[in-house]
Amino acid sequence: MKKLYDQYERLHDYVRISITDRCNLRCVYCMPKEGLPFFPTDRVLSQDEIVQLITNFAQLGVHKVRITGGEPLLRTDVVDIVRRIKEIDGIEDVSITTNGLFLAKKAKALKEAGLDRLNISLDTFKPEVYKEITRGGNINQVLDGIATASALHFKKIKLNIVLIRGQNDDELLDFINYTKDHDVNVRFIEFMPIGNSLEEWKQEYVALDSVFDLCKQAGLDYHPIDLAGNGPSDNYQVEGYTGSFGLIHPISSKFCENCNRLRITADGYIKACLYWNEEINVRKLIYDFDAFKAGVQRALDNKPLNHEMAMKTTDRIIDKAPTWRHMSQIGG
């Protein structure tokens, strides 16, 4: 089996595939408040195209798949997509990133279809702040979804928290203490300038350095732990707590040297790097395996060693222009 390596000898065995650009929220770090019309239905990958894409990737050594959006649970066929992907020979792990609003209704069917893991976006515990960040969301639906999913015993549930200055950076300890009685991995993620102006990003960016200081001030004894997989999160557990917390810092501490992932947009383009404008249309190649393989390899051959979110060493400010797609159009 030919496996997927880039020019820096990084093995790529993980695909993140967006199955829709549509979302029922407009989170401030993902979409603009207005505009950004959704793709017409025929521009979005069909269920059969998604399954064929992943089948091709499995023949190239990919064994891990994450389904993203937009909001993937908006697709009425999402359970069938999960089931069919999980049935592909070579695919060992299937997960979904969701805002959780429909999770209470769909978690059981997803588990029965073979879904292994869940990442749920929850940027705050405060209802009004949640409504502000998401531009209208109801946090109680998310909390119900988390409770439902927890009772079903997925392999792992992770909560994604994008830190935004002045909005949720005062809740760090609340999230860490949530792991005392909840078997989840809370992940703090640095706000990235994707689809945002650099000036706006500069005002809202929060580095993760303060997490350890807050833990020490609160008298929390924490230690590093290893979680399954080779993702970008540095993980820790407070002594005596059930769950854990992780730090994902794409800005202040790059993890590019171990990158093993490829992204497929909802309209069928491959992005070898989240913050890299180059894209290759692989949708038109999916039923010609040799052409597909060549297209994927071409994307890998052009993959940069590091992303373009390069920091100036003096003032920690990005000095590169952001990618042209918004996050909802790439796949979170």
From Swiss-Prot:
Gene3D superfamilies: Aldolase class I. Residues 7-221 form the Radical SAM core domain. It holds the Pfam family Radical_SAM. S-adenosyl-L-methionine binds at Y29, G70, S121, M192. Its cofactor is [4Fe-4S] cluster. The keyword Magnesium does not apply. One of its GO terms (biological process) is Mo-molybdopterin cofactor biosynthetic process. CDD domains: Radical_SAM, Twitch_MoaA. [4Fe-4S] cluster 1 binds at C23, C27, C30. Binds 2 [4Fe-4S] clusters. Binds 1 [4Fe-4S] cluster coordinated with 3 cysteines and an exchangeable S-adenosyl-L-methionine and 1 [4Fe-4S] cluster coordinated with 3 cysteines and the GTP-derived substrate. Signal peptide: none annotated. [4Fe-4S] cluster 2 binds at C256, C259, C273. It comes from the Bacteria. It catalyses: GTP + AH2 + S-adenosyl-L-methionine = (8S)-3',8-cyclo-7,8-dihydroguanosine 5'-triphosphate + 5'-deoxyadenosine + L-methionine + A + H(+). GO terms for molecular function: 4 iron, 4 sulfur cluster binding; cyclic pyranopterin monophosphate synthase activity; GTP 3',8'-cyclase activity; GTP binding; metal ion binding; S-adenosyl-L-methionine binding. Its EC number is 4.1.99.22. InterPro entries: Aldolase_TIM (IPR013785), Elp3/MiaA/NifB-like_rSAM (IPR006638), MoaA (IPR013483), MoaA_NifB_PqqE_Fe-S-bd_CS (IPR000385), MoaA_twitch (IPR010505), MoCo_biosynth_MoaA/MoaC (IPR050105), rSAM (IPR007197). GTP binds at R16, R66, T97, K158, R261, L262, R263. Keywords: 4Fe-4S, GTP-binding, Iron, Iron-sulfur, Lyase, Metal-binding, Molybdenum cofactor biosynthesis, Nucleotide-binding, S-adenosyl-L-methionine. PANTHER family: MOLYBDENUM COFACTOR BIOSYNTHESIS PROTEIN 1 (PTHR22960:SF0), MOLYBDOPTERIN COFACTOR SYNTHESIS PROTEIN A (PTHR22960). Catalyzes the cyclization of GTP to (8S)-3',8-cyclo-7,8-dihydroguanosine 5'-triphosphate. Monomer and homodimer. Belongs to the radical SAM superfamily. MoaA family. HAMAP family: MoaA_B (MF_01225_B). This is GTP 3',8-cyclase. It comes from Limosilactobacillus fermentum (strain NBRC 3956 / LMG 18251).
